[in-house]
Protein backbone atom coordinates (compact mmCIF):
# COMPACT_ATOMS: atom_id res chain seq x y z
CA UNK A 1 0.00 0.00 0.00
CA UNK A 2 1.42 3.39 -1.00
CA UNK A 3 1.96 6.12 1.56
CA UNK A 4 -0.94 8.13 0.17
CA UNK A 5 -3.20 5.06 0.20
CA UNK A 6 -2.20 4.33 3.80
CA UNK A 7 -3.10 7.93 4.74
CA UNK A 8 -6.52 7.47 3.12
CA UNK A 9 -6.97 4.18 4.98
CA UNK A 10 -6.02 5.77 8.30
CA UNK A 11 -8.50 8.60 7.80
CA UNK A 12 -11.18 6.16 6.66
CA UNK A 13 -10.98 4.47 10.06
CA UNK A 14 -11.59 7.79 11.82
CA UNK A 15 -14.43 8.66 9.45
CA UNK A 16 -16.00 5.22 9.97
CA UNK A 17 -15.86 5.77 13.74
CA UNK A 18 -17.62 9.14 13.40
CA UNK A 19 -20.31 7.77 11.09
CA UNK A 20 -20.75 4.74 13.36
CA UNK A 21 -21.44 7.04 16.31
CA UNK A 22 -23.78 9.14 14.17
CA UNK A 23 -25.72 5.99 13.22
CA UNK A 24 -25.89 4.93 16.89
CA UNK A 25 -27.23 8.33 17.93
CA UNK A 26 -29.85 8.25 15.18
CA UNK A 27 -31.01 4.80 16.29
CA UNK A 28 -31.11 5.93 19.92
CA UNK A 29 -33.18 9.03 19.09
CA UNK A 30 -35.51 7.00 16.88
CA UNK A 31 -36.03 4.50 19.72
CA UNK A 32 -36.76 7.27 22.23
CA UNK A 33 -39.17 8.96 19.82
CA UNK A 34 -40.96 5.66 19.16
CA UNK A 35 -41.32 5.05 22.89
CA UNK A 36 -42.80 8.52 23.46
CA UNK A 37 -45.22 8.13 20.54
CA UNK A 38 -46.28 4.67 21.73
CA UNK A 39 -47.34 6.15 25.07
CA UNK A 40 -50.44 7.56 23.38
CA UNK A 41 -52.44 10.62 24.30
CA UNK A 42 -53.74 9.62 27.70
CA UNK A 43 -52.68 10.97 31.08
CA UNK A 44 -52.94 14.35 32.72
CA UNK A 45 -52.51 17.57 30.73
CA UNK A 46 -49.07 17.95 32.30
CA UNK A 47 -48.05 14.45 31.19
CA UNK A 48 -49.31 15.08 27.64
CA UNK A 49 -47.40 18.38 27.47
CA UNK A 50 -44.25 16.70 28.75
CA UNK A 51 -44.64 13.85 26.24
CA UNK A 52 -45.15 16.34 23.38
CA UNK A 53 -42.07 18.28 24.47
CA UNK A 54 -39.95 15.13 24.47
CA UNK A 55 -41.32 14.12 21.06
CA UNK A 56 -40.42 17.53 19.64
CA UNK A 57 -36.94 17.38 21.17
CA UNK A 58 -36.27 13.90 19.69
CA UNK A 59 -37.65 14.93 16.28
CA UNK A 60 -35.42 18.02 16.24
CA UNK A 61 -32.36 15.97 17.20
CA UNK A 62 -33.14 13.39 14.48
CA UNK A 63 -33.45 16.19 11.93
CA UNK A 64 -30.09 17.57 13.02
CA UNK A 65 -28.43 14.14 12.85
CA UNK A 66 -29.84 13.52 9.37
CA UNK A 67 -28.73 16.93 8.10
CA UNK A 68 -25.02 16.26 8.71
CA UNK A 69 -24.78 13.04 6.67
CA UNK A 70 -22.93 14.66 3.77
CA UNK A 71 -19.28 15.52 4.52
CA UNK A 72 -19.59 14.83 8.24
CA UNK A 73 -15.79 15.00 8.71
CA UNK A 74 -13.71 17.49 6.75
CA UNK A 75 -10.57 18.22 8.71
CA UNK A 76 -8.00 17.28 11.31
CA UNK A 77 -5.68 19.28 13.55
CA UNK A 78 -2.44 17.77 14.86
CA UNK A 79 -0.90 19.34 17.97
CA UNK A 80 2.72 19.38 19.11
CA UNK A 81 1.90 16.90 21.88
CA UNK A 82 0.68 14.38 19.28
CA UNK A 83 -3.04 14.75 19.87
CA UNK A 84 -5.38 14.82 16.90
CA UNK A 85 -8.71 16.58 16.72
CA UNK A 86 -11.10 15.82 13.89
CA UNK A 87 -13.25 18.72 12.73
CA UNK A 88 -16.71 18.25 11.28
CA UNK A 89 -20.24 19.48 10.84
CA UNK A 90 -21.34 18.45 14.34
CA UNK A 91 -19.69 17.56 17.63
CA UNK A 92 -19.71 13.85 18.52
CA UNK A 93 -18.48 12.03 21.62
CA UNK A 94 -18.18 8.34 22.41
CA UNK A 95 -20.42 6.69 25.00
CA UNK A 96 -17.54 7.35 27.43
CA UNK A 97 -17.68 11.07 26.54
CA UNK A 98 -14.36 10.99 24.67
CA UNK A 99 -14.39 13.43 21.75
CA UNK A 100 -14.71 11.85 18.32
CA UNK A 101 -15.50 14.94 16.28
CA UNK A 102 -15.29 18.66 17.09
CA UNK A 103 -18.04 20.91 15.77
CA UNK A 104 -16.56 23.39 13.29
CA UNK A 105 -18.25 26.24 15.20
CA UNK A 106 -16.67 25.32 18.54
CA UNK A 107 -13.82 27.32 20.06
CA UNK A 108 -11.63 24.20 19.90
CA UNK A 109 -11.96 24.21 16.09
CA UNK A 110 -10.87 27.82 15.73
CA UNK A 111 -7.21 26.97 14.90
CA UNK A 112 -8.45 24.98 11.89
CA UNK A 113 -9.44 28.29 10.31
CA UNK A 114 -7.03 30.72 11.92
CA UNK A 115 -3.65 28.98 12.29
CA UNK A 116 -0.93 30.13 9.90
CA UNK A 117 2.72 29.11 9.52
CA UNK A 118 3.75 32.32 11.28
CA UNK A 119 1.09 32.07 14.01
CA UNK A 120 0.22 28.43 14.60
CA UNK A 121 0.29 28.13 18.40
CA UNK A 122 0.67 24.46 19.29
CA UNK A 123 -0.81 23.28 15.96
CA UNK A 124 1.70 21.41 13.83
CA UNK A 125 -0.47 20.40 10.88
CA UNK A 126 -3.91 20.98 9.40
CA UNK A 127 -5.39 18.24 7.21
CA UNK A 128 -8.29 18.70 4.81
CA UNK A 129 -10.26 15.49 4.30
CA UNK A 130 -12.40 15.02 1.19
CA UNK A 131 -15.31 12.57 1.32
CA UNK A 132 -17.58 11.10 -1.31
CA UNK A 133 -20.57 9.95 0.68
CA UNK A 134 -18.88 8.06 3.54
CA UNK A 135 -15.65 7.27 1.72
CA UNK A 136 -12.39 9.21 2.11
CA UNK A 137 -11.24 10.11 -1.39
CA UNK A 138 -8.55 12.67 -0.64
CA UNK A 139 -6.38 14.31 1.99
CA UNK A 140 -4.30 17.48 1.80
CA UNK A 141 -1.90 18.53 4.54
CA UNK A 142 -0.77 21.99 5.49
CA UNK A 143 2.22 21.81 7.80
CA UNK A 144 2.13 24.90 9.96
CA UNK A 145 5.26 24.22 12.03
CA UNK A 146 7.96 23.69 9.41
CA UNK A 147 10.40 22.46 12.07
CA UNK A 148 8.22 19.51 13.05
CA UNK A 149 8.80 15.89 12.01
CA UNK A 150 5.48 15.92 10.17
CA UNK A 151 6.92 17.97 7.32
CA UNK A 152 8.89 14.99 6.05
CA UNK A 153 6.06 12.55 6.69
CA UNK A 154 3.52 14.65 4.78
CA UNK A 155 6.01 15.26 1.98
CA UNK A 156 6.79 11.55 1.66
CA UNK A 157 3.08 10.67 1.68
CA UNK A 158 2.41 13.18 -1.08
CA UNK A 159 -0.21 15.01 0.98
CA UNK A 160 1.65 18.29 1.56
CA UNK A 161 -0.02 21.37 0.06
CA UNK A 162 -0.45 25.09 0.60
CA UNK A 163 1.97 27.53 2.20
CA UNK A 164 3.36 24.72 4.33
CA UNK A 165 4.74 23.02 1.22
CA UNK A 166 6.44 26.22 0.09
CA UNK A 167 7.88 26.99 3.53
CA UNK A 168 9.05 23.40 3.99
CA UNK A 169 10.81 23.58 0.65
CA UNK A 170 12.49 26.88 1.50
CA UNK A 171 13.53 25.84 5.01
CA UNK A 172 15.09 22.57 3.79
CA UNK A 173 17.75 24.51 1.86
Please state what every model-predicted region is:
Residues 1-172:
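Extended, charged low-complexity regulatory segments
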